[in-house]
Amino acid sequence: LTLLAAILFSGSFRGNPALPDPDGDGIRTLAAKVATGVFRVTRHPMMWGFALWGLSHMLVAPRMDSFLFNGSLVFLALAGSYGQDRKKEATMGDAWAKWERQTSFWPRLSQLGKIEPRTLLIGAVFWFAATWAHNLAGSYEAGIFRWL
């Protein structure tokens, strides 16, 4: 789950019409394009990355503090995505409606194979670095480092 979260998160920085845009023109241009990469999986890859990260941490550390912190993160990511859709509908109108028609709120796992190799590599490197850094942060080893 955390590898998928890292891939979705990493891919969300390029060509994302949900990011803030003061003048609005660049975002409308992005929303008019055909969805590619992680946006074929979900229109909120960054937020789903946060949600999957939180869910995975609740699964590996089923304690009350983990449920409270990570459960809040999951809730904020998904509720925030829903709220962002409503805000973009109001501010972008038809451009966002077109984007919504070609993307999905819920991840479409069948589209994972459409993610560019570059994004997969960046996500894997990010995941590797984040799992390696657990020990440096004073936590226990995570991911593959638990077994090395």
Protein language model annotation of sequence segments:
Residues L1-L4, R40-W48:
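Membrane-interface loop-to-helix entry segments
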Residues L1-V34:
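Portal/gating segments that form or line small-molecule/metal binding sites
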Residues D25-V38, W99-L109:
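Short membrane-interface loop/juxtamembrane segments of multi-pass integral membrane proteins
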Residues R43-L148:
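Hydrophobic transmembrane alpha-helices
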